[in-house]
């Protein structure tokens, strides 16, 4: 089973779309887009994704991708 990375469509529109595209190309991840993840305060202030249910943030799309891979390395399944 692959790790699940979930994105909010509104956060994608705020700049996380580049992170989504990069992660979606990784066959070892299941990357999913949702209409809303109900993290509206977080969504309005930063780029983020849920990685197996845990919030991972980044100031930029590149930082978000790096933080997601770091999270996955530190939390093996």
From Swiss-Prot:
InterPro entries: DUF1450, UPF0349. Transmembrane segments: none annotated. It comes from the Bacteria. Pfam families: DUF1450 (PF07293). Belongs to the UPF0349 family. This is UPF0349 protein LMHCC_0204. It comes from Listeria monocytogenes serotype 4a (strain HCC23). The lineage of its organism: Bacteria, Bacillati, Bacillota, Bacilli, Bacillales.
